[in-house]
């Protein structure tokens, strides 16, 4: 499968340091930062540093180190923010959009972590 990566997308520019962000955590392969238009009291974006467009692209082509680092970083963020149920938090939602039907706005794979209120049903 072929994925067209646009290296001028906003997350690529953030990763290159061209656009500032409110970093929550950074690891070797992953950057997590606050969303500039939050949809919940807690809204953090977890972004792999590699050039991946969607989850399936990331899962198919990322190295084992990138895959593990990304998921452990996401879990670490939930714990750091006090929303992980295992750490006494009341929960969170993760969302990753892929392609036009999901309304993916930035063509760089990323995971939304949303928390801080009851999120309700995902779909009606």
Predicted feature descriptions by range:
Residues 1-124:
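HIT superfamily nucleotide-processing domains
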């Amino acid at each position: 499968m072929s994925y067209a990566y646009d290296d001028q997308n906003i997350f690529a520019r953030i990763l290159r340091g061209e656009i500032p962000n409110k970093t929550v955590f950074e690891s070797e392969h992953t950057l997590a930062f606050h969303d500039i238009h939050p949809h919940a009291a807690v809204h953090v974006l977890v972004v792999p540093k590699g050039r991946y467009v969607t989850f399936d692209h990331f899962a198919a082509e990322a190295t084992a180190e990138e895959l593990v680092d990304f998921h452990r970083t996401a879990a670490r963020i939930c714990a750091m923010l006090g929303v992980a149920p295992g750490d006494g938090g009341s929960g969170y939602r993760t969302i990753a959009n892929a392609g036009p039907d999901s309304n993916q706005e930035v063509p760089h794979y990323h995971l939304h972590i949303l928390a801080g209120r009851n999120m309700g049903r995902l779909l009606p």
